[in-house]
C-alpha cells in the first residue's frame, strides 16, 4: 500500500496537552498533543456519535464526552466501558512545521 501523506494543520494549531478536531479530505479526525508528540484518531467515538475533540484529554487518554469511555490516543485501545471497540489511529509526521497524516 502506498503511503499518502496529507497536510492537516500547522503544528502551532495544536496546543500543548490539547485535542483539536479537523477534517482532512472529508474525514473527521482528532489530533492530540501528548508529551511533545502528535497523534491522530478518528474523531467519532466507536460507542456513540460523540466527537472525541469535545472530550477530555488526560495524558495519553481521551475521555468521550457522551458516556465517559476512554481510549489510549497513541494506540487507539479502548480502555474502559462502555467502549469496547478500539478507535482507528493514523500515522503522523511533522514536515516544515506542518502536521501530516497518512490516510492510506
From Swiss-Prot:
Family: Belongs to the bacterial ring-hydroxylating dioxygenase ferredoxin component family.
InterPro entries: Rieske_2Fe-2S, Rieske_2Fe-2S_sf
Effect upon mutating residue 49 to A: In strain: G7
Keywords per UniProt: 2Fe-2S, Aromatic hydrocarbons catabolism, Electron transport, Iron, Iron-sulfur, Metal-binding, Plasmid, Transport
Protein name per Swiss-Prot or TrEMBL: Naphthalene 1,2-dioxygenase system, ferredoxin component
Pathway: Aromatic compound metabolism; naphthalene degradation
Cofactor(s) demanded: [2Fe-2S] cluster
Effect of residue 91 to A: In strain: G7
Gene3D superfamilies per the UniProt record, alphabetical: Rieske [2Fe-2S] iron-sulphur domain
Subunit composition and interactions: The naphthalene dioxygenase (NDO) multicomponent enzyme system is composed of an electron transfer component and a dioxygenase component (iron sulfur protein (ISP)). The electron transfer component is composed of a ferredoxin reductase (NdoR) and a ferredoxin (NdoA), and the dioxygenase component is formed of a heterohexamer (trimer of heterodimers) of three large alpha subunits (NdoB) and three small beta subunits (NdoC).
Function: Component of the naphthalene dioxygenase (NDO) multicomponent enzyme system which catalyzes the incorporation of both atoms of molecular oxygen into naphthalene to form cis-(1R,2S)-dihydroxy-1,2-dihydronaphthalene. Functions as an intermediate electron transfer protein via a specific interaction with iron sulfur protein components (ISP) (NdoB and NdoC). Also able to catalyze the cis-dihydroxylation of biphenyl and phenanthrene.
GO molecular function terms attached to this record: 2 iron, 2 sulfur cluster binding; metal ion binding
Primary gene name: ndoA
Note on cofactor: Binds 1 [2Fe-2S] cluster.
The Rieske domain, residue ranges: 6-101
GO BP of this protein: catabolic process
Residues where [2Fe-2S] cluster binds: 45, 47, 64, 67
Lineage: Bacteria, Pseudomonadati, Pseudomonadota, Gammaproteobacteria, Pseudomonadales
CDD domains xrefs: Rieske_RO_ferredoxin
Result for mutant: residue 85 to E: In strain: G7
